[in-house]
Design a protein with these regions (language model features):
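Charged, amphipathic alpha-helical oligomerization/scaffolding segments
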Residues: 27-30, 257, 264, 296, ...
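C-terminal helix-coil-helix/basic helical segment that borders enzyme active sites and/or dimer interfaces
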Residues: 40-43, 303-347, 360-363
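A short core secondary-structure module
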Residues: 167-203
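Glycine-rich phosphate/cofactor-binding loops in nucleotide/flavin-utilizing enzymes
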Residues: 361-426
Length: 426
């Protein structure tokens, strides 16, 4: 039974997204609706959303941030993250699958040189970027096992890359892979942007998490794969607010997961005909206690949306700071973006996981049936919340509040150092 128009949540354009947000969003909302229709089935059958991602990209979703003059939509960061939140409400796997793409778009927007226009054209043409950064196992903290080696014969012949990465989210859908590596000739840590469609590049859809099952994460292996010289980029030149940006995509996933749970369970309550003898009304849809549960979850979705929007505004200021020519102000804005997203993460990690669990209080035993798959909302939210543990972010926020300590903007994960050796930094 479809949701009556009078009961659908209005798509309110939040202040930070601008008055023209709905004009932008209307292009994608019919597609979001189709994506939502198949989300539960895809999750249950572990069907990767290849067609859905391709349809989004063909509709211009991947070029949202590209300036209008270059063929994109010229969306602001608040607009982008509002759209990602709406997409997450349809299927939270898709924003995470495209997280690396939008981060690389952002990096190219603040970059200089001829490569910037070349990449903008690729984004407009519908090319997708994935990522391969994390290495599992005994790789020491701060080390990089994936190596980039210059081809023999001069500086213009390019490089080869060899290594194995896990958590390669989105790479299975991608044309290019944003890969964290280290050069063998000078030891510099780099981003190697690897063409995904070549010999020596393989992907395995072996991510076995209980949530976010169809993000296309898993293992990427590079065996002497070619990298063009212009696509070996010093890591130190990456956009400064990258960690905050990556986190903000997960915030959108959390916010969208609450909305998705609210919508589905509200419809379940609306359609339910059985009641309890000790309830309060002749239908679940009229029972004030059941309505209270749905209302509280709806309020959580509202708070989550507002939190994401606030973090996105801080990111927009950080983006604009890159062009001010004022290094001190640029640093201040980047620190602010990191702190804003950290605070948002601390709040939403708890808010989302509790809300998508509490929503079951509006159901009965039938609500936990596997065919309904309502539990996927909790599994998805819990999985997104477990990325980048919030407990460390809370300490960082507190250290800044008490001691004025700047937040770290780049961090790594790996095997603990031996003895009293301090952890290295990127």
């Amino acid at each position: 039974m479809p949701v009556p128009a009078s009961l659908q949540r209005p798509a309110v354009a939040v202040t930070g997204a601008g008055a023209d947000y709905d004009l932008l969003a209307v292009r994608f909302r019919p597609l979001f609706a189709r994506i939502a229709e198949g989300a539960s089935r895809r999750e249950q059958e572990h069907e990767l959303p290849r067609a859905e991602i391709r349809e989004l990209i063909d509709a211009g979703f991947g070029a949202l941030r590209v300036p209008v003059a270059d063929g994109g939509s010229g969306a602001s960061l608040p607009q982008l993250f509002r759209l990602l939140t709406e997409l997450a409400a349809a299927d939270p796997n898709l924003p995470q699958a495209l997280r690396a793409h939008f981060a690389f778009v952002e990096d190219r927007l603040v970059s200089t040189g001829p490569q910037r226009s070349r990449w903008r054209a690729r984004f407009v043409d519908g090319e997708i970027v994935g990522s391969s950064w994390t290495e599992v196992g005994a790789v020491p903290l701060g080390d990089v096992g994936t190596k980039v080696t210059r081809h023999a014969g001069g500086t213009d012949t390019g490089f080869s890359i060899t290594g194995t990465k896990y958590y390669s989210t989105g790479s299975i859908f991608a044309d290019w892979i944003d890969t964290f590596a280290q050069r063998t000739d000078n030891g510099v840590k780099v981003i190697a942007v690897v063409n995904a469609h070549q010999p020596g590049v393989t992907h395995r859809d072996d991510w076995d998490g209980f949530g976010q099952r169809t993000t296309g994460s898993g293992t990427s292996t590079f065996e002497q794969a070619h990298v063009d010289p212009e696509n070996v980029i010093d890591f130190d030149t990456r956009f400064k607010y990258q960690t905050a940006f990556y986190q903000a995509v997960l915030l959108a996933v959390l916010a969208g997961s609450i909305t998705a749970a609210e919508r589905e369970v509200a419809q379940e309550v609306r359609n339910r005909t059985r009641i309890f003898s000790h309830g309060n009304a002749s239908s679940f849809a009229a029972d004030p206690q059941i309505l209270q549960v749905i209302g509280q979850v709806s309020a959580a979705a509202y708070a989550a949306d507002a939190t994401v929007e606030r973090a996105a505004r801080a990111l927009q200021l950080a983006h604009e700071g890159a062009f001010l020519g004022d290094d001190d102000e640029d640093e201040r804005r980047n620190d602010a973006a990191e702190l804003e997203t950290a605070k948002a993460q601390v709040i939403l990690s708890s808010l989302a996981t509790h809300a998508v669990s509490d929503v079951f209080d509006a159901l009965a035993a039938s609500g936990v049936g596997r065919s309904k798959n309502f539990d996927r909302h909790w599994r998805n939210a819990r999985t997104a919340a477990n990325h980048n543990p919030w407990v460390f972010k809370a300490r960082i926020v507190g250290d800044h509040s008490v001691n004025g300590t700047p937040p770290p903007r780049v961090w790594s994960i790996g095997a603990a150092p031996v003895g009293n050796t301090p952890p290295p930094r990127l």
